[in-house]
Amino acid sequence: MAAEGKNVLIMAGGTGGHVFPALACAREFQARGYSVHWLGTPRGIENELVPQAGLPLHLIQVSGLRGKGKLSLLKAPFTLVKAVLQARRIIRQLKPVCVLGFGGYVTGPGGVAARLCGVPLVIHEQNARAGTANRLLVPLSARVCEAFPNTFEASDKRRTTGNPVRPELFMDAQRTPLGERRARLLVLGGSLGAEPLNKLLPKALSEVPAALRPEVFHQAGKQHAPITAERYHEAGVAAQVEPFIKDMAQAYGWADLVVCRAGALTVSELAAAGLPSMLVPLPHAIDDHQTHNAQYLAREGAAFLMPQATTGAAQLAERLNEVLMQPEKLNVMAGTARRLAKPAATSTVVDICLEVAHG
């Protein structure tokens, strides 16, 4: 354990969208000489990623309430009180100078416990529409960080920081000018794949004239890669289909255009990589946050927002034809995306935490 006054507690769990930006901040804290501890729950992805990063993981028992039965709802107050007490015990033991929350079920009880222990609380919201836990924790927080402008109401606490993303994404890709080669299309559906995109892209690309058709690199998810490859074959479209892309920085560096969902980190990574995109938000995301994320790039002209309900193969093919016939349009969109990036997001969030800890 680090010397007293050098511990930081990070709270993040459930999905990679919460955990990956938190890990980026953890590395920055460590680079500045702080010992980072992690608060999570037993079921989230943090149980795999945090130990892999060599960080001590502390667990509390808490889960979400959406879609739960009446018995679970009746038990909820007792479960939450128990989780707060568990988190308070951990905070008292670690004596962190600051608690930094990135969302997930763990953040609510952990944030309340931080306030009870008198430890400064900073929250970071990755999406353009704030999650429930972060919205409720605003009054208890010393600072509220937002990835996208105006996610929270204006106040002295609010700071627009961007999302912490991998620094290698900000490196300029040395691409051959578009007029001298075929365009390159990257299709992303997340690590598990997005089956509607897997079905849509082969059909849409078959309607793009062969002379204009881009090279295609498609991440389809482990379960869906074989059938997606078969769909491309049946459509007469050449494509490289993979279950999962391990080196996203390389994939972004290769691409000229991306078709994907609109998760918070994906949107931030597209800006960091300076890539134009066609964003098809997940229709059933909580609070429709993916549509709000997509609007951030679309409003500025860095992306096209294409709702799944109204985007068929013909509509997507029409949009692809439009940009593939105008390479200069892709170049303008790429420049706009890069201008929206926040390369200092990680260091800014850590600066804010240490400011409230020692200020």
From Swiss-Prot:
Keyword entries, A-Z: Cell cycle, Cell division, Cell inner membrane, Cell membrane, Cell shape, Cell wall biogenesis/degradation, Glycosyltransferase, Membrane, Peptidoglycan synthesis, Transferase
Enzyme Commission designation: 2.4.1.227
Top-level taxon: Bacteria
Keyword Cell wall biogenesis/degradation in annotation: yes
Gene Ontology molecular function, alphabetical: UDP-N-acetyl-D-glucosamine:N-acetylmuramoyl-L-alanyl-D-glutamyl-meso-2,6-diaminopimelyl-D-alanyl-D-alanine-diphosphoundecaprenol 4-beta-N-acetylglucosaminlytransferase activity; undecaprenyldiphospho-muramoylpentapeptide beta-N-acetylglucosaminyltransferase activity
Main location: membrane
EC primary class: transferase
CDD domains, sorted: GT28_MurG
Binding positions (UDP-N-acetyl-alpha-D-glucosamine): T15, G16, G17, N127, R166, S191, I245, A264, L265, T266, V267, S268, E269, Q290
Locations listed in the record: Cell inner membrane
Membrane topology according to the record: Peripheral membrane protein
GO biological process: carbohydrate metabolic process; cell division; cell wall organization; lipid glycosylation; peptidoglycan biosynthetic process; regulation of cell shape
Pathway: Cell wall biogenesis; peptidoglycan biosynthesis
Cellular component, GO annotation: plasma membrane
Biological role: Cell wall formation. Catalyzes the transfer of a GlcNAc subunit on undecaprenyl-pyrophosphoryl-MurNAc-pentapeptide (lipid intermediate I) to form undecaprenyl-pyrophosphoryl-MurNAc-(pentapeptide)GlcNAc (lipid intermediate II).
Protein name in UniProt: UDP-N-acetylglucosamine--N-acetylmuramyl-(pentapeptide) pyrophosphoryl-undecaprenol N-acetylglucosamine transferase
